[in-house]
């Protein structure tokens, strides 16, 4: 049985037009796991209660939410997390060539980790990188 992939959304406080990937230490993030569509909020709340009781851990910050990601540019990155900038630059150029620009006004850099870094060689790590975009000159 395949488990759902871990996802992170990253942002930097005060960065509305771009993100400084050279300063990942300033990133803030939320880690997510996509749930199957049949899981409803009541199911989630029951599971959190059960896990809290059985694991004796604090799950108070775990939450159930949905969101619309909007228009994005996305690419598969293979290799070290530290070499993602090269892929991100290619994505930015592709978006620009298509008439789009980055849009971090209310959306985030998003990574979907397809590989387990504990079991996968660094050069074989696979990460989907997704960045929000908007049409150039569409500054809502």
Predicted features, each with a name:
Residues 2-6:
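Short, small-residue-biased leader/transition segments that mark boundaries at the very start
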Residues 9-16, 22-39:
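Extracellular-facing segments of soluble proteins and assemblies that are Gly/Ser/Thr-biased and enriched
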Residues 14-17, 61-63, 108-115:
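Glycine-rich beta-strand-turn "strand-cap" elements at beta-sheet edges
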Residues 22-24, 63-68, 123:
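Short glycine/proline-enriched loop/turn "hinge" motifs that connect secondary-structure elements
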Residues 33, 128-135:
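A short, hydrophobic, proline-anchored segment that marks a local hinge/packing element in signaling
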Residues 44-83:
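A mid-sequence, solvent-exposed acidic-amphipathic segment
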Residues 48-53, 83-103:
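Long, well-ordered alpha-helical scaffolding segments within enzyme catalytic domains
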Residues 105-125:
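Beta-rich nucleic-acid/ligand-interaction surfaces
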């Amino acid at each position: 049985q395949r488990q759902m992939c871990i996802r992170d959304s990253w942002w930097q406080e005060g960065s509305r037009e771009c993100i400084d990937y050279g300063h990942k230490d300033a990133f803030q993030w939320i880690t997510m796991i996509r749930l199957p569509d049949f899981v409803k909020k009541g199911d989630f709340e029951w599971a959190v209660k059960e896990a809290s009781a059985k694991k004796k851990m604090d799950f108070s910050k775990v939450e159930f939410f949905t969101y619309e990601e909007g228009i994005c540019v996305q690419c598969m990155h293979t290799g070290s997390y530290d070499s993602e900038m090269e892929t991100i630059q290619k994505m930015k150029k592709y978006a620009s060539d298509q008439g789009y620009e980055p849009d971090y006004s209310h959306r985030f850099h998003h990574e979907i980790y397809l590989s387990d870094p504990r079991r996968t060689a660094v050069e074989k790590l696979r990460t989907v990188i997704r960045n929000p975009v908007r049409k150039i000159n569409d500054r809502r």
